[in-house]
């Protein structure tokens, strides 16, 4: 089996919430993408319930793109502790952490249900599984803890 970076990361050593550059990959025709770990919850201690995670996913898809160019995708981890963010550009982790902080602040302070993109049966594959209350609560928890630009040493932005 292929070695997968996230399965080699020592999840007992990281200190969430944080942003981590997992890797840069060069494509066979020359393009480069960057893969980030946006870890919101401490692994093996807590996880984000699916409704809140789903709502954060929809909001991040739009709000993070408002702040950072070149985002290809933002997708939740199966363990429900954070997200992969794939970008055409390699940003330093402090820049990504600041964008994430601004995004979570907007979610906590001003987002209403009508602001969430893609929450109808026509535009979402599981449209009934959203929770703005949970997304706002997690935004508050994450912001209160502070987002670090380093996964192992707290460097809060």
From Swiss-Prot:
Cofactor note: Binds 1 Fe cation per subunit.
Keyword Lyase part of the UniProt annotation: yes
GO biological process: quorum sensing
SUPFAM superfamilies per UniProt: LuxS/MPP-like metallohydrolase (SSF63411)
Binding residue positions for Fe cation: 54, 58, 124
Pfam families, A to Z: LuxS (PF02664)
Cofactor(s) the protein requires to work: Fe cation
Molecular functions (GO terms): iron ion binding; S-ribosylhomocysteine lyase activity
E.C. no: 4.4.1.21
Disulfide bonds: none
Protein's job: Involved in the synthesis of autoinducer 2 (AI-2) which is secreted by bacteria and is used to communicate both the cell density and the metabolic potential of the environment. The regulation of gene expression in response to changes in cell density is called quorum sensing. Catalyzes the transformation of S-ribosylhomocysteine (RHC) to homocysteine (HC) and 4,5-dihydroxy-2,3-pentadione (DPD).
Similarity section: Belongs to the LuxS family.
Subunit comment: Homodimer.
Name under which the protein is recorded: S-ribosylhomocysteine lyase
Gene name per UniProt: luxS
């Amino acid at each position: 089996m292929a070695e997968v970076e996230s399965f080699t990361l020592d999840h007992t050593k990281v200190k969430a919430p944080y942003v981590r550059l997992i890797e840069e990959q060069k494509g066979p025709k020359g393009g480069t993408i960057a893969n980030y770990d946006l870890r919101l919850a401490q692994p093996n201690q807590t996880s984000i319930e699916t409704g809140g995670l789903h709502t954060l996913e929809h909001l991040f898809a739009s709000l993070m793109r408002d702040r950072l160019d070149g985002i290809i995708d933002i997708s939740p981890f199966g363990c429900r502790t954070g997200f992969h963010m794939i970008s055409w550009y390699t940003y330093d982790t402090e820049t990504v952490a600041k964008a994430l902080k601004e995004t979570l602040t907007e979610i906590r302070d001003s987002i209403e249900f009508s602001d969430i993109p893609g929450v109808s049966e026509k535009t979402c594959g599981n449209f009934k599984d959203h929770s703005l209350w949970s997304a706002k609560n997690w935004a508050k928890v994450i912001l209160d803890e502070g987002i670090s630009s380093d996964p192992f040493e707290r460097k809060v932005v």
